[in-house]
Amino acid sequence: MHVLKGINLDIEEGEFVSIMGQSGSGKSTLLNILGILDNYDSGEYTLAGTRIWNLSESKAAYYRNRMIGFIFQSFNLIGFKNAVENVELPLYYQGVGRRERHRMAMEYLDRLGLAQWAEHYPNEMSGGQKQRVAIARALITKPKIILADEPTGALDSKTSVEVMQLLKELNREQGMTIVVVTHESGVANETNKIIRIQDGIIGNIEINEDHNASPFGINGYMK
């Protein structure tokens, strides 16, 4: 069974994009291909000039670690490691020394307003704090692209707005390429381009620079 059918998609460096669709639409499969978690049957996927195709697991892990930052709905923090240790982890796999990776992790936690929470464990933090730790972990390798899979799905409305504002700032101030997968119109409305996918096919692509896509609008709610 083909989950995706004839997808033709370009995401330029520095774009802030959402891929929107209901459960079963194919958006998660597309994200897994973009994140080098799944292979594809035909066609071509190029990431930052590198063709991604039929890689060994070690090569796929190498590219993921150096080119992609992941943000997950469930945060995917390691429960027995504190915040700074969780943020350090991608650098550990890159072979960065302990002192340097600790310094860098503290720098990113400080940027996200969490320096004072560095020694706290995930079960001691709120959902918003855990997602900020996850964002710091995604950023620390200076990836080419951030892939955020339902990043507000486990958060309340207020915290969802804060997380999306943070992603907007990263895109605007650092030129970070960010792709958000969501089924929520309010989340998609915060991005500059909305790609709607249904039954494995891209329905339409909406430029959303004014952030007033229906049904939420500028004064709407996140959920």
Enumerate the predicted regions with their spans.
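ABC family nucleotide-binding domain
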Residues: M1-I197
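Conserved beta-strand-loop-alpha-helix hinge in the C-terminal portion
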Residues: I201-K223
